[in-house]
């Protein structure tokens, strides 16, 4: 198995990050001070602590985990079950030519499996991860009721899990140099383009980056990836200041309801966006009568309690 000796300088620098020093480390540590239940939770390794993730899952049905891939690297490489844990991703891991990219890939799946396992209360190795046509990760079999999403860039790994509906996550470096002139027609609706064009350059770049990550997160949640044109839908703020879908063809439909969109800066290092849709709870189904005991029309059995989200 490829290991530390072929990791390359980038991976060794990541491995050396036993703690969270530097600007990103400070930003991740600061997440613990946030009270917002929609904020990402920093998990420094497989041993957690996972309490905040469990709290968010119990309270909202979804949670977002973030970490530095170097902090999970040793645990991933020394795990004797890494190959079965990666499953169908093992060939891609082995065939990725650049060592740092190969290890980052393995760690990202390692983090996603451990986060999903925590949400489901199972062992990470028991989960079977597959991919839809657009690249969206899906858990099959045992974890089929849990939605998952993954993003990684530079040092950062971001994983979203949801028991209550689709979820998508995206992250970009906060200092990413993006050209409004080149991307306007590809990313923005006409209204969004006009609003951004009226802003000072620095504010416009920051707003465009935030918009980009929101649209990435939304299309990931839908499972469309880059197949859906970003300029075909937009975002705006409603009367309460919440981010909502806008500029939809034909005014939208019922499938556009129930979405929540949030963006969080990780200090001055990254911009993180999350799209999550809470689906209606399934209607309770009545129990079938026991064999040989016809149900009394005057004494119907209690309906089956809906599954806890």
Predicted features by range, described:
Residues 2-309:
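Core catalytic alpha/beta fold that binds nucleotide/phospho-ligands
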